[in-house]
A protein has these predicted regions:
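Transmembrane alpha-helical segments of multi-pass membrane transport proteins and ion-pumping complexes
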Residues: 15-27, 61, 65-73, 90-102, ...
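Pore- and pathway-forming membrane helices of multi-pass small-molecule/ion transporters and channels
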Residues: 16, 31-48, 94-95, 102-131
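Alpha-helical membrane segments and adjacent membrane-interface helices in multi-pass membrane proteins
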Residues: 35-73
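Hydrophobic alpha-helical transmembrane segments in multi-pass integral membrane proteins
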Residues: 69-79, 122-136
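Cytoplasmic-side transmembrane-helix entry/capping segments in multi-pass membrane proteins
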Residues: 54-63, 84-88, 107-116
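Alpha-helical transmembrane segments and their membrane-interface boundaries
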Residues: 1-49, 133-136, 140, 147-167
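Structural signature of hydrophobic alpha-helical transmembrane segments
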Residues: 23-37, 75, 79-91
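Membrane-interfacial segments
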Residues: 29-30, 75-79, 83, 104-108, ...
């Protein structure tokens, strides 16, 4: 079998097997935003599931999650008009994320921070800020599941399958 098809079919099997397990089990551990894992796994896959990047990507996603909570609270507290508030919040916090991320570039992957922020805002933005409850923690758990379970474990599983097939 050609290398291309070995990679494609083992990846197809890995994608068919592992993410659905997360999708089924995540609500049982209190995570109602399980699909976030797939988004985060997709970004991690763009880095070739490089395990050396797993920690900076994870920290970036978690920074984005925290950033979304802060932004949501800032936007609710603002007396400015909705459009001005959204613009200024995104302008200031986006710029700060890049500057802080650059200072911490060995620890935090900036694109993950920005993507995590967007994910968090998409989920929490429409919510009543007083009812966020465990939502930020659920988002963070799903982000980590995307990187570590779907990304790292998935990559190791696929490599194992390839090794078995090539024997």
């Amino acid at each position: 079998m050609k290398e291309k098809w070995i990679n494609a079919l083992t990846l197809a099997f890995t994608v068919a097997l592992l993410p659905p397990i997360w999708a089924v089990l995540s609500p049982y551990i209190g995570v109602t935003v399980g699909a976030v894992a797939l988004i985060c796994a997709g970004l991690f896959a763009c880095l070739n599931n490089d395990i050396k990047m797993a920690v900076p990507v994870s920290l970036g996603f978690l920074c984005g999650d925290i950033w979304a909570v802060i932004a949501t609270n800032v936007m609710v507290a603002s007396n400015l008009g909705a459009n001005v508030t959204v613009y200024l919040t995104l302008f200031i916090m986006g710029g700060l994320a890049v500057v802080i991320g650059t200072l911490l570039d060995k620890l935090v992957f900036i694109p993950a921070w920005l993507a995590g922020w967007a994910i968090g805002l998409t989920i929490m933005g429409p919510m009543d800020v007083t009812n966020l409850g465990t939502t930020p923690f659920q988002i963070g758990a799903a982000m980590l599941a995307g990187v570590w379970y779907v990304g790292v474990v998935g990559d190791l599983f696929q490599k194992l399958l390839i090794k078995i097939i090539k024997k």
